[in-house]
Amino acid sequence: MECADYGLTRKLERDNLNLNPLQRGGVLPAAARKALHEFGDGYSVCDYCDGRLDQVTRPAINCFLDDLADFTGSDAVRTVHGAREGKFAVMHALCERGDTVVVDGNAHYTTHLAAERNGLEIVEVPSTGHPSYEVTPEAYREVLEETIDRVEVKLAVLTHVDGNYGNLTDARGVADVCRKLGVPLLLNCAYSMGRLPVNLRELGVDFVVGSGHKSMAASGPIGVLGMKSEWEDTVLRRSGRHEKKELELLGCTSRGAPLATLMASLPYVRERVSRWDGEVKKTRYLVSELEDIGGIEQLGVRPKEHDLVRFETPVFHEIAASHPRKGFFLYEELKKRGIVGIRRGQTKWFKCSIYGMTEEQVQYVVDSFRDIVEENR
């Protein structure tokens, strides 16, 4: 049997400015690339394991988890395969089939899948709709009170920053509402933990989940699950047959390269969140400059509080209507200028992020969009 050529190269994405929001927070620093080489083989972190991944001392996973708990303001923390697995584990531990959970209208599809796989009923908190798509504590209060009148709500889930509009929600405000109504709250921080400061205790939530590969400069798949101490016995309960193994995590979770790169990146990530205000400033500049071109409008809450931006772009859609390359022209014009990350054929709208770019790179992106409009309008 001959295997196909699987096209295992990312030269285009590595050698150009990548605007894809999925990629910006997962770029590995030098220390993580070294760890990737060192721990790339299979179960490489398990050479000295005595049955519990969180207790491995060589490499010092136990110490790393202590530092990770401190970083996230959690009483207990575990690595999981991704934020979605963290959400599923919490739902499975707290709920029974047929129970009800309340989620926000901007929730990631994996929140819905985690609930569906657990056999749960989903009640949605609506956003304000176009153009801001904001989810507010008041909306949570109204939906929770109305739902609690009918059924018991076992868990509320809030998306800290959503992947469609990049709205940073008022997590502390929603947590206050949930606490008063006696409903535990899980905060989905896939787009925030590792980019901006996230502290479970300060926000007043019960659980946080994060994404190492999306926002914490790690290889995927790996996520973070943090919790208050009061939930440890429930979520981290042990197997009756294999007494060392934590049942909801199916024993050991992410091993090898993903875990090693997350460990290696933590010092870098801890430092970079202190520069979050600068990232917001750059993003607001991008929005201002692109909107100044005309025919481009930012969706979501204003002013921006996160690097992920969604733009409506009728100017590019109008150009595409008469351009020989139709909807592919924007992708191709950007690629010629060394910019990637916008989907091929997409001109009505697009999402982008300049997280981690220098001011010079941001200016180059702005100038490139302006030039494309001027040359093709």
Swiss-Prot record:
The keyword Cell division does not apply. It catalyses: O-phospho-L-seryl-tRNA(Cys) + hydrogen sulfide + H(+) = L-cysteinyl-tRNA(Cys) + phosphate. Homodimer. Interacts with SepRS. Its EC number is 2.5.1.73. The lineage of its organism: Archaea, Methanobacteriati, Methanobacteriota, Methanomada group, Methanobacteria. Keywords: Protein biosynthesis, Pyridoxal phosphate, Transferase. Pyridoxal 5'-phosphate binds at A83, R84, N188, S211, G212, H213. Its cofactor is pyridoxal 5'-phosphate. It holds the Pfam family SepSecS. GO terms for molecular function: Sep-tRNA:Cys-tRNA synthase activity. Belongs to the SepCysS family. GO terms for biological process: translation. Converts O-phospho-L-seryl-tRNA(Cys) (Sep-tRNA(Cys)) to L-cysteinyl-tRNA(Cys) (Cys-tRNA(Cys)). The modification N6-(pyridoxal phosphate)lysine is found at K214. PANTHER family: CYSTEINE DESULFURASE, O-PHOSPHO-L-SERYL-TRNA:CYS-TRNA SYNTHASE. This is O-phospho-L-seryl-tRNA:Cys-tRNA synthase. It is an enzyme of class 2 (transferase).
